Amino acid sequence: MNTAVTLLTEQAPQPIEEFGQLERQIIIILDFGSQYSELIARRIRETQVYSEVLSYRTPAEHLRQLNPKGIILSGGPSSVYSDRAPHCDPEIWNLGVPILGVCYGMQLMVNQLGGEVAKADRGEYGKASLHIDDPTDLLTNVEDGTTMWMSHGDSVTKMPPGFEVLAHTDNTPCAAVADHEKKLYGVQFHPEVVHSVGGLALIRNFVYHICECEPTWTTAAFVEEAIREVRAKVGDKRVLLALSGGVDSSTLAFLMHKAIGDQLTCVFIDQGFMRKYEPERLVKLFQEQFHIPVEYVNARDRFLDIMSGVTDPEEKRRRIGHEFIQVFEETSKNLGPFDYLAQGTLYPDVIESADTNVDPQTGERVAVKIKSHHNVGGLPKDLRFKLVEPLRKLFKDEVRKVGRSVGLPEEIVQRQPFPGPGLAIRILGEVTADRLNILRDADLIVRQEINQRGLYNEYWQAFAVLLPIRSVGVMGDQRTYAYPIVLRIVKSEDGMTADWARVPYDVLEAISNRIVNEVKGVNRVVFDITSKPPGTIEWE
């Protein structure tokens, strides 16, 4: 997902109350446009406490109804003294719950409560040593001199009444502040980022000691709740699910099948752009090993036909998406009728997208999109389902935990990200049957060599790319003129940024030797050493 620094919160999602009022303990993050708002929520959940990201515009009364144990104000790109700076409802200071302001959030707190903020003589960016003046409360067990990550051009110049300084850095006199009596806290740094060495300890102090939360957000509790809620929502109706083989749709299928059994129909549309042996393996795995019926639709020829002469990557995606809709529509009508579409929406999708549609008669959310990893755009307007989205509260790492808990095999749980258009966007230029076969064989070798050495889980993605050019080579005494294969192997935490992997030379050598000797039509292998940014992980 892409998280922009610019303010994106005006269309931030409403609280997730799809199955009624939340009963669990919750910490709310009010988003002021920070690139780290989602990360704050993830850090809170790592403490086994539930959290949600809401718009800074959320009224205090709405927050009161949610009954949060605490509120965190995110950072943001604005200056609080700017005319267009985003401000929260000032009534939140009277809610009587602990509040932690982070970077911009701290400056907003200071500004609204009677302090002053101004442009700093020197901005502070990157790592800084935190000197602790008050080691109690928020900073308990945070080591004096610990490294914290700074990113600010403004600073607090006057404290509000009742506040005191908890910590400072060489350039920032008010790096952490508090009104202990009202349980209002602010930090100028970002405790949520990995560079902040003492950040997790600070977050745990806020969650457990100040907000007095209990670690009740567990995988087992979620699965039990999700199954109960799916049954309550669906009743005896039929549900359709588009299976892709990825961890999201596979976890969704397992969870839905546990909840409603034969009321679920899984459809796998084979568009011909998956990796070698994957379609057969997927269907066999679900039907024979897990006893979850899958309707297999072989649409390879249809998708290959629409790729004829197409070289532009966006046009490839558009055509694949359009054809997927057509096949999906035909299949759903043949197998239907269905009342619900099970969709693998995750919480980052909820945070980032306002693409929802509400039926004016029932108030139900209805499908206007297939899950984004299918890259298929909107469904036809006459193909309307009510949505059931049991994973929409979860981040990706939480989905993997749920997958394991419901019995999903590790090969799917740990499956590396794979684009919806598949190999069609890993073949630069026109997609043909011959090029697909070449790339499938090369890609299989990459995965085999990495798997054999136990390196698969070391990399975010490891795959082959086929270039639409030919290079000169020599095999035996013969000159060759064949395709080059690009190896793309990267490390990443979340796909937002990535670094090229320092793959051992012997592994690269083995991959290269096997590809040029075993894959007909290839005589050269090159290794992509571009990070993201400036490059992207995929070539198209």
UniProtKB/Swiss-Prot annotation:
Catalytic activity: XMP + L-glutamine + ATP + H2O = GMP + L-glutamate + AMP + diphosphate + 2 H(+)
Boundaries of every GMPS ATP-PPase domain copy: 217-415
Domain of life: Bacteria
InterPro entries linked: Class_I_gatase-like (IPR029062), GATASE (IPR017926), GMP_synth_C (IPR001674), GMP_synth_GATase (IPR004739), GMP_synthase (IPR022955), GMPS_ATP_PPase_dom (IPR025777), NAD/GMP_synthase (IPR022310), Rossmann-like_a/b/a_fold (IPR014729)
EC main group: ligase
Gene3D superfamilies: 3.30.300.10, 3.40.50.880, HUPs
Binding residues annotated for ATP, in chain numbering: S244, G245, G246, V247, D248, S249, S250
Protein function: Catalyzes the synthesis of GMP from XMP.
PANTHER family: GMP SYNTHASE [GLUTAMINE-HYDROLYZING], GMP SYNTHASE-RELATED
Subunit-structure text: Homodimer.
Name of this chain's protein: GMP synthase [glutamine-hydrolyzing]
Source species taxonomy: Bacteria, Bacillati, Cyanobacteriota, Cyanophyceae, Nostocales
Gene designation per UniProt: guaA
